[in-house]
């Protein structure tokens, strides 16, 4: 052994069954010790001989090993026609173009973005058309747009509806619900002269306030309504069954009650009010005028506790006289709603007890009562279903969170001898949402998602300690071992919970805060859990407004000390889409792009005693795969979440 080493070249033939036969020049080098072998080589000791051989996917002497580009060698890879070969260190990947999915035995097949939830970006009203490698969106008849954004056009809506602006889009809606308010007191026909001109008006409006709640139906004298030439409705107001009607608004000037005119539309709404589709006045100074007598209301709004009675020639709703209420605790209506608690008292029943005026407030007097009309004339007060606001107190046990407060009732601002207290409480069974709200500092991430034609929704993701998802981690950090399980919950907060299900499309971990980091460990991919990790359990996904999964704690192999969690979510329309994933067999990457605007982020997860963990791992394992795997050794992890 006078030389450093001796080189022996051996020609070998490697047969890959059913695929290719390739020849490779594998070099074996005799060495003095295994320390001389390259990091991408194996060392074999056979008696007195120590040899170094490059790993599969590498070529060289054993002292030096370089990556073998399988993509550049004909027959060295098994990527099918239509797919692309991408060389990696020691191996290669077969990838498909966007819009295709790699399937064993079939190669790259087209992905039907229209049938799989979360893949298309079509507007809620648009029709999705699948094409080879892509898809297209087409707005419905009467709508305009590129399919991802659809807007109605005038005259395209059904009876009683109109094309109105909602947010930054035009949609078919009921103008009784979608309108703007004109509440100027000077619009009253009893107000004097002025120089107001209604320029810039365009769309549906409702008149409110002390000036009147509907347009005047008779010719208004000039120099009234704070303008020179008052505008009035030349015709009668419609009834509710007539829907939207066309009318003419006239302007009075120089002895002509209709010297100028403008075409408008009117609709009668439930509740006894009207909405008007107005245009700006044809000249200045002209303004729309309201009838001041209409502010007194009509008997169309009377509740079951009221009669329509005349007083000084004016008809109005007045409380019936047959009330005989002695127990105030029978008056309250308590509503335990998801986000708040509402207590309502009947004004007519309070009046029968002698309360001509009602001053109502909670423990925190800033939370005071307000009037509202529904099936009755109510005075109500609302407190958030949280500990603290309005003086609300929360008590929690193993199964429920109970919120309590006290309602104070007086008939004068200055209380002398009549002060009534009503204690009330609401109990909520503990679930993910209630548990988060009852925790002091839950570890949670949230994001707002916009749904076309529906509005903004808030989705939250939180970390829980137990499999019943009722005990969230609190504070800024938490300590776990890799033997422990982490329970992750996502939930839709508010919005139309009856229409949408929350679908977790991709949930994964990265070693950096960058959610687009190419090194990802998928927990859920393409809506289905990773089948090669037996610690992953998806409890709920695409079935309700919440999602839940659990996974055993892990770290990334290599020089990574941090782990971040990310979850891409999608609001699935349960009426028009199939939301619950169907998961069976081996799952393959679809090559779809993750929409970062729909990703929730939590992290980082920081390991303690890094050096000790690394040394133990090196002594107990001959090889460490360069992929993200759960740790086999027990180690302490500290989670510090932004």
UniProtKB/Swiss-Prot annotation:
Stretches for region D10C: 174-293
Region of interest called External hydrophobic patch (EHP), as start-end residue ranges on this chain: 599-607
Internal hydrophobic patch (IHP): annotated segments: 455-465
Location of the region described as ZP-C in the Swiss-Prot/TrEMBL record: 455-590
Primary location group: membrane
Lipidated residues (GPI-anchor amidated serine): 620
Gene3D superfamilies: Laminin (2.10.25.10), Zona pellucida, ZP-C domain (2.60.40.4100), Zona pellucida, ZP-N domain (2.60.40.3210)
Chain positions covered by the region annotation Flexible ZP-N/ZP-C linker: 431-454
Domain free text: The ZP domain mediates polymerization, leading to the formation of long filaments. The core of the filament consists of interlocked ZP domains which assemble into a helical structure. Each ZP domain consists of an N-terminal (ZP-N) and C-terminal (ZP-C) region connected by a flexible linker; the linker allows the ZP domain to wrap around the ZP-C subdomain of the preceding subunit. The heavily glycosylated N-terminal part of the protein (containing several EGF-like domains) forms branches which protrude from the core and are involved in pathogen capture.
Residues that carry a glycan: 40, 78, 134, 234, 246, 277, 324, 397, 448, 514
Record's keyword annotation contains Iron: no
InterPro entries: EGF-like_Ca-bd_dom, EGF-like_dom, EGF-type_Asp/Asn_hydroxyl_site, EGF_Ca-bd_CS, EGF_dom, Growth_fac_rcpt_cys_sf, NOTCH1_EGF-like, ZP-C
GO cellular component, one term: apical plasma membrane
Tissue-wise expression: Detected in kidney and pancreas.
Gene field: UMOD
Propeptide: 621-642
ZP-N as annotated region, ranges: 335-430
Gene Ontology biological-process annotations: antibacterial innate immune response; defense response to Gram-negative bacterium; neutrophil migration
Protein name: Uromodulin
Compartment(s) where it occurs, according to its Swiss-Prot or TrEMBL record: Apical cell membrane; Basolateral cell membrane; Cell projection, Cilium membrane
GO molecular function: calcium ion binding
Limits of the ZP domain: 335-590
């Amino acid at each position: 052994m006078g030389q450093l080493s001796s080189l022996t070249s051996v020609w070998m033939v490697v047969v890959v069954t059913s695929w290719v036969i390739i020849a490779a020049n594998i070099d074996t080098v005799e060495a003095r010790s295994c320390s001389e072998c390259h990091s991408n080589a194996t060392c074999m000791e056979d008696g007195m001989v120590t040899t170094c051989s490059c790993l599969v996917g590498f070529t060289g002497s054993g002292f030096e090993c370089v990556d073998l580009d399988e993509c550049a060698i004909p027959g060295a890879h098994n990527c099918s026609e239509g797919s692309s070969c991408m060389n990696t260190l020691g191996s290669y990947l077969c990838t498909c173009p966007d819009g295709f999915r790699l399937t064993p035995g079939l190669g790259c097949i087209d992905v039907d973005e229209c049938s799989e939830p979360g893949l298309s970006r079509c507007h809620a009203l648009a029709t999705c058309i699948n094409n080879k490698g892509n898809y297209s969106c087409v707005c419905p008849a009467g709508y305009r747009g590129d399919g991802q954004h659809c807007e109605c056009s005038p005259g395209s809506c059904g009876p009683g509806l109109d094309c109105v602006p909602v947010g930054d889009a035009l949609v078919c809606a009921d103008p009784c619900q979608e309108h703007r308010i004109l509440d100027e007191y000077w619009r009253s026909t009893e107000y004097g002269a002025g120089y107001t001109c209604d320029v810039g008006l365009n769309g549906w409006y409702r008149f409110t306030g002390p000036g009147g709640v509907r347009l005047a139906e008779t010719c208004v004298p000039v120099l009234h309504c704070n303008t020179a030439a008052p505008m009035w409705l030349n015709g009668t107001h419609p009834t509710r069954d007539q829907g939207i009607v066309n009318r003419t608004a006239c302007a009075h000037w120089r002895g002509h009650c209709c010297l100028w005119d403008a075409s408008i539309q009117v609709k009668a709404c439930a509740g006894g009010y009207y909405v008007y589709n107005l245009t700006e006045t044809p000249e200045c100074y002209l303004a729309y005028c309201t009838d001041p007598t209409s502010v007194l209301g009509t008997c169309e709004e009377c509740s079951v506790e009221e009669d329509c009675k005349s007083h000084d020639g004016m008809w109005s709703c007045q409380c019936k006289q047959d009330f005989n209420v002695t127990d105030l605790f029978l008056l309250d209506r308590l509503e335990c709603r998801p986000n708040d608690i509402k207590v309502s008292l009947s004004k007519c029943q309070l009046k029968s007890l002698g309360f001509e005026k009602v001053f109502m407030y909670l423990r925190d007097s800033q939370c005071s009562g307000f009037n509202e009309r529904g099936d009755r004339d109510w005075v109500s007060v609302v407190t958030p279903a949280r500990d603290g606001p309005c003086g609300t107190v929360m008590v929690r046990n193993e199964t429920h969170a109970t919120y309590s407060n006290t309602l104070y009732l007086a008939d004068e601002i200055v209380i002398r001898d009549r002060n009534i207290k009503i204690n009330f409480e609401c109990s909520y069974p503990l679930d993910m949402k209630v548990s988060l709200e009852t925790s002091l500092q839950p570890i949670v991430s949230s994001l707002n998602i916009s749904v076309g034609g529906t509005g903004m929704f808030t989705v939250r993701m939180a970390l829980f300690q137990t499999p019943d998802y009722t005990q969230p981690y609190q504070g800024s950090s938490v300590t776990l071992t890799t033997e422990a399980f982490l329970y992750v919950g996502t939930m839709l907060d508010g919005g139309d919970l009856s229409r949408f299900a929350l679908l977790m499309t991709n949930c994964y971990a990265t070693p950096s805060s960058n959610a687009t980091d190419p090194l990802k460990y998928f927990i859920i991919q393409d809506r289905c859990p990773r089948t090669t990790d037996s610690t992953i359990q998806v409890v709920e996904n695409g079935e309700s407004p919440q999602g839940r999964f659990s996974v055993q704690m892990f770290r990334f192999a290599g020089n990574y000390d941090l782990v971040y969690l990310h979850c891409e979510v999608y609001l699935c329309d349960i009426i028009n889409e199939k939301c619950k994933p169907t998961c069976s067999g081996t799952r393959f990457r679809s090559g779809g792009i993750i929409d970062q605007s729909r990703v929730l982020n939590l992290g980082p997860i920081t390991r303690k005693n890094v050096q000790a963990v690394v040394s133990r791992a090196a002594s107990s394992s001959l090889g460490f795969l360069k992929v993200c795997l759960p740790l086999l050794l027990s180690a302490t992890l500290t989670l510090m979440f932004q």
